[in-house]
Amino acid sequence: IFPKTLQINEGEKLSVKIYKGFYVLKPKSGGSSVGVKIIKGQNSIPNKNEFKWKDLMAEEFVGSMELTVTVLKDKPLCVTEIKAAQNEEFYNYRAKYERNRSIHEIPAKIPKQSYEQAMSWALRAHKIVGCKGISRSDFRYDKINDQLYMLEINTQPGMTETSLSPEQALFCNISLSEMVKIIIEEASYEC
């Protein structure tokens, strides 16, 4: 299940296509939450001229928990809950790359069925997209309704000291050097 998402093309007014309530406005391309804004209804709609991107997506803001699953060599590793630090509105660029800007709870404390569903969906997305070596899929989880939503698959997940994939690998007793070796070996099979 995916959140309701609308495409907003260059020249279209944002106010014409928005959802009632909260939603996420983000560029169609890019990464690391660059250009992402949380919109809290009609009164907080930014001017489209504020964005350097031509095409945007308006995605319904769903769930209360942000989750992620790394798949390494066709095997999902674990589910991590990502929490932005108190001084961050959401898991934005700073929260991803600066120390002490986010908290990673590993493994995520969600019902077993939802945990297994996240692992299964991440593996399925990895295979459908044709990923080799590594991918990381992001989810939102609605605790009240016990509903998992898939947001996206990252085909080149971060590999910094604050990145989620190396942390998940380490949790599964896979060192960074071993993880990199697996990624290289998987890529070399395609050559």
Located regions from the model:
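Phosphate-binding site of ATP-dependent enzymes
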Residues: K40-S114, L148-Y149
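Conserved metal-phosphate-binding beta-hairpin within the catalytic cores
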Residues: E60, V69, H126-M159, A169
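A long amphipathic alpha-helix within ATP-dependent nucleotide-binding catalytic cores
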Residues: F51-D55, Y97-I144, I183-E186
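C-terminal active-site "lid" helix and adjoining low-complexity regulatory extension at the edge
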Residues: Q147-C191
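A short, glycine/Asx- and small/polar-enriched loop/turn
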Residues: I18-K20, K73-D74, K143-L148
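Active-site nucleotide/adenylate-binding loops and adjacent lid/helix of ATP-dependent enzymes
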Residues: I1-M65
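Short beta-strand-to-turn element immediately C-terminal to the catalytic PLP-Schiff-base lysine
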Residues: I8, V36-G41, V71-K73, D142, ...
